[in-house]
């Protein structure tokens, strides 16, 4: 079965990157269905307990038009070692070397070795609309109700597996 959208084929989109040292590792997707490209450390770094460290990749990127890069955590590092990622937006006009801010929430040093996969780069489309200030906004059923306002864990929608 084939799908014909009726539109002319779009040219392939490319993510351009530059290696700034022989220790930079080409980003790769672990599987064909992976959303992100794995980013690897270009140096040995220790992330102290309850602290953070900036991990170099020695890579810079040129994103397709209308796209920015988001640095996201790797789930295995979070689950096994309490490692998370911070400050994860790479603007489309940034051409400098990308580093990854790792937070260590554990009580032990986290040793990053050169070549270790430390995060993933996910490409996301973005809009930059013109701003228009208004004295009021359209009303909604939710209104200004904030954190936790849409319900807790006991919604009755999903059966509990903890009983």
UniProtKB/Swiss-Prot annotation:
SUPFAM superfamilies named in the record: dUTPase-like (SSF51283)
Cofactors demanded by this protein: Mg(2+)
InterPro entries, A to Z: dUTPase (IPR008181), dUTPase-like (IPR029054), dUTPase-like_sf (IPR036157), dUTPase_trimeric (IPR033704)
Pfam families, sorted: dUTPase (PF00692)
GO process terms (BP): dUMP biosynthetic process; dUTP catabolic process
CDD domains per record: trimeric_dUTPase
GO molecular function list: dUTP diphosphatase activity; magnesium ion binding
Enzyme Commission number: 3.6.1.23
Enzyme class: hydrolase
Catalytic reaction annotation: dUTP + H2O = dUMP + diphosphate + H(+)
Biological role stated in the UniProt entry: This enzyme is involved in nucleotide metabolism: it produces dUMP, the immediate precursor of thymidine nucleotides and it decreases the intracellular concentration of dUTP so that uracil cannot be incorporated into DNA.
Family statement drawn from the similarity comment of this UniProt entry: Belongs to the dUTPase family.
Designated name of the protein: Deoxyuridine 5'-triphosphate nucleotidohydrolase
